[in-house]
Amino acid sequence: MKIGFYNIQGGTGKTTVAANFAYILSQSVKTILIDCDIYGGTTAVLFGLEDKEHNLNTYLAGDSAIEDIIYHYDDLAIIHTDVSSKVFGYKSDLNRFETLVKELEEEYDVIIYDFPPNITEDNPLIGYVGEFELVNKVVVVGEDSIPSIVNSLKTIELITDLGIGLTGIIVNKYRGLTDISEIIDDVIGVLPYDQNVERQWVESTPIVKIKTKFTKEMTALANEIASIYLEKDLASLRALRLAKAISELTEVEKSEKDFEDYLE
């Protein structure tokens, strides 16, 4: 299962929601988080990976192997992007991104993408439209303001036009400034504004590990989304993997028997 978090507007808290959602999921299913913002990603800061040599940028440049760029925070696997100014000097072969995803699909139950807030081809969400199924569902992360609602509506329309499945919109940083439900039909969750969220960037730990009002709502929302949208798909995925493993085992046994018959 591949879920992307996106909005054409930056600053809505998309990385916070994606990273904490992924962290919560990782406690029950094998999950990897990919920061897809090759120029402005900040996942490395959240998880304390700023000094790591290998990252998505070096992989896309052909300088790192897949196994080199995967790091772990507790049970969550993470692929981050470079947070230094070196990002502007990397050459990026986005064809390598497809190779990456196809390999990760074999290893992880859930892939979470934190997509950048742009509509250019260096955004995998846009660059791979119609080529292979990069993502199964997209969650739009907006915030409690009129400008964000406007851009969230545009984002929803864009996702629909691209033919990508829309899970809905999460309204982040809610302070009661707007009546979201009267404007947008696809709201699946509301997360409160909580100044404690900024602590995660200082402490390099996901905010859901710290007791806050945001943590309570984020955890409940993540579990609800998982129960509605993931359980059936994960059961099907595991059944397919089991069938494939049995098939491969059968082929091995058949080959061994053929070899034994040959020796006889």
Curated annotation (Swiss-Prot):
Q: Name one GO cellular component term.
A: cytosol
Which UniProt key words apply to this protein?
A: ATP-binding, Nucleotide-binding
What transmembrane ranges does the database entry give?
A: none
**One Pfam family in the UniProt entry:** AAA_31
Q: Which GO terms describe its molecular function?
A: ATP binding; ATP hydrolysis activity
Chain sites annotated for binding ATP: I8, Q9, G10, G11, T12, G13, K14, T15
Q: Does the keyword Nucleotide-binding apply?
A: yes
Name assigned to this protein: Uncharacterized ATP-binding protein MJ0410
Give the originating organism.
Methanocaldococcus jannaschii (strain ATCC 43067 / DSM 2661 / JAL-1 / JCM 10045 / NBRC 100440) (Methanococcus jannaschii)
